[in-house]
Design a protein with these regions (language model features):
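Auxiliary Fe-S-binding modules of radical SAM enzymes
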Residues: 2-46, 54-55, 240, 247-331
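N-terminal [4Fe-4S]-dependent radical SAM core
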Residues: 2-111
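Hydrophobic faces of well-ordered beta-strands that scaffold small-molecule active sites
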Residues: 57-61, 110-113, 143-145, 169-173, ...
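Acidic (Asp/Glu)-rich catalytic clusters
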Residues: 101-105, 131-138, 160-168, 200-204
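Distinct, well-ordered alpha-helical segments
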Residues: 124-132, 153-162, 225
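Core AdoMet radical
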Residues: 85-97, 101-124, 139-152, 168-194, ...
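Conserved C-terminal portion of the radical SAM core fold
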Residues: 193-252, 268-291
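Structural recognition of alpha->loop->beta junctions
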Residues: 79, 136-140, 227-243, 312, ...
Length: 331
């Protein structure tokens, strides 16, 4: 499938929402393209529905992996924002998830999401066994694998290339920020050059890459966060982006920063920043997340972040108010 807005020379010049008639007359009427589903950004849900013809759902699973930033190889305790469970608080059994979802979406298609910790951090034989066991389920049509850019050795890349030739696949890379001072503060334990090499390696093999950024890390200004968005957006191989609202959660090292540090003082402040970010992301890049999603049982701050629908509605309303859209100000 050719990505929408694939003409990079013109992708940021006109609103993708303006009808031809409205553009000619200078009017302010909108005819959203079908793949936006009435949204002003290019959501992964819309992309998947166009590609697969049905609603496609990611099923979060725990592959039993750890992380080099936890086992002593690079560090212990993980990144400072990470809880004991990594990023996969909602992971559960595949069949249980399908059973719960099938009544509401009887024709849905499913991707298995290896989410917790670093899901390429194991001997390649072990990785093959785990990936193939999941793909053996006839209801699973592909994989989504969360990992670190420094955990993609050559033999793992070859395995991923093999899977990519036979099944649907994308990798999710936890970058969080491009700023080295912040990276050291959050104990990320790799530098930006490692990320650049990983993106190039995935591009060479035709493997889709989704990059995670965190908004609200201590010490980062609005402009620093926008710099991270611009840098990642400049990667020609970028398939998608996740913008995470920093959640301070129980069990993380950041827990001890609260209440002296809070990521944002209001929903409105966060919504404004997300809209600024979306304007700088090319419109063909798929958007996989625009907020945080920590369970209430472990969330410390910000207390409003579990109100996901209010945040997303706020983003939609502000983009509409500004007559703006994803990619309007991309460079």
């Amino acid at each position: 499938m050719n990505p929408p807005f694939s003409d990079k020379n013109h992708r940021c010049l006109t609103s993708p929402f303006a009808s031809a008639e409205a553009t000619q007359q200078g009017a302010h009427r909108f005819a959203p393209p079908p793949y936006f589903d009435g949204q002003r950004y290019h959501s992964i849900n819309t992309w998947l529905k166009r590609k697969c013809g049905e609603k496609t759902i990611k099923l979060a699973i725990d592959g039993g992996f750890t992380c080099p930033n936890r086992d002593g190889t690079k560090g212990v305790g993980g990144c400072t924002f990470c809880s004991d469970n990594g990023s996969g608080e909602f992971a559960s059994n595949i069949e249980d998830q399908i059973r719960l979802l099938s009544d509401k979406w009887p024709h849905a298609r499913y991707l298995a999401y290896f989410q917790n910790h670093t899901n390429t951090y194991a001997p390649v034989a072990e990785l093959r066994k785990k990936y193939e066991a999941v793909l053996a389920n006839p209801k699973i049509e592909g994989l989504v694998i969360g990992t670190r850019p420094d955990c993609l050795p050559e033999d793992v890349l070859e395995l991923l290339s093999e899977i990519n030739r036979k099944h649907f696949l994308w990798l999710e890379l936890g970058l969080q920020t491009i700023h080295e001072e912040t990276a050291r503060a959050i104990h990320r334990c790799y530098d930006l050059r490692v990320f650049d090499r990983a993106m190039e390696a995935l591009r060479e093999r035709g493997i889709k890459a989704v990059v995670h950024l965190i908004l609200g890390l201590p010490g980062e200004s609005r402009e620093m966060m926008l710099d991270s968005v611009r840098y990642v957006s400049s990667k020609p191989e970028l398939f998608g982006m996740k913008l995470h609202l920093l959640n301070i959660v129980k069990g993380s090292q950041m827990e001890y920063l609260y209440p002296d540090y809070q990521p944002f003082d209001s929903i409105d402040a966060y919504v404004r920043l997300v809209c600024d970010c979306l304007e700088r992301i090319p419109p063909e890049v798929t958007i996989h997340r625009l907020t945080g999603d920590a369970p209430r049982s472990i969330l410390i701050s910000p207390p409003w972040s579990f109100n996901k629908r209010t945040i997303l509605n706020g983003i939609h309303d502000r983009l509409h108010l500004l007559d703006s859209w994803q990619g309007k100000r991309c460079e």
